[in-house]
Amino acid sequence: MSAVGIAEIEKIKQRIRICDYLCVAQLFLQDNFLLERSLEFSDIKPRLLGHWGTCHGINVAYANLKNHFQKNQNFTFILGPGHGFPALQANLLIDGELLKVDKKATLDKSGIEYICKRFSWPDGFPSHASPLTPGIITEGGELGYALANAYGLALGHPEKTIAVLIGDGELETATAIDSLNLQGLLAGSNNGKVLPILHLNGYKISAPSIYARKSERELNELIRGFGFTPIMINGEDAENFQEALNKKVEAPFYILKTEKGSGGPNSHHESHQIPLKNPKTDEEELKQLEEWLKSYQPEEILTILGENYD
């Protein structure tokens, strides 16, 4: 084991598992939020809205960054793929940030029910990050602006470190790819650091992303051309992620590899939005959803939250 301890790694994994569960629950459930009985058609929301495919990768990035920078008060995380809002919401609930602006978002059964039922719900929470989301400076519904915002935040603030998660589909936008040129503006001691993280999960909404089609060598050379040092990360290996964050290199650019929709019943582009279309009326899909939810061991969630978070 590296300098990162076994207990740290296990806590990272636990957090990812809990947040993945909360994402699925937000997308599908209007009742029985912790699976305290068998799932029924009446537990499923009448209209399913949202995006599952990017959520696991967001949870992986958030948990690992949280562990690495937990004592750094000048660290900021910017989420590019705002359509992965269920993941951001889950993490804000666990960290108590949502509670600061919404007293119903408690870290218990009641709070979990609250965020899940009200996701994509009338007078509830939106399907994408919004100005009402605590700490948000990038909405993320229209992709491409996260990197530019990160560099703007770093300019003139030498104390700041900003990690920005960019989707591989997002990096195809003109604004995002051109924003990599802004790295040169950070030269000198009067500016902060920007840590780009490319979430390479392979697919956008309907096809493989351009960057997923490139070989590792091609992608690395592209990144080097913008003045960065590329660092590959296996998204399913928390120790590897922590080791990558601990590397001392000039202008790191992290490439986080995950499988789109990891953990769900369908992978690749089919999982970009809602991977199960009819669990409210289809018995087989309802069973698939129940098995999917059970894979995260929901019976342990309240105990883990009570022991590790306050």
Residue ranges and their predicted role:
Residues 9, 21, 58, 85, ...:
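Alpha-helix initiation and N-capping motif
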Residues 132-309:
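Glycine-rich ThDP/TPP pyrophosphate-binding loop and its adjacent helix/strand module
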Residues 27, 80-82, 91, 199, ...:
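Structured loops at beta-to-helix junctions and adjacent beta-edge loops in soluble globular domains
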Residues 1-51:
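Cofactor-/ligand-binding subdomain signature composed of acidic, glycine-rich
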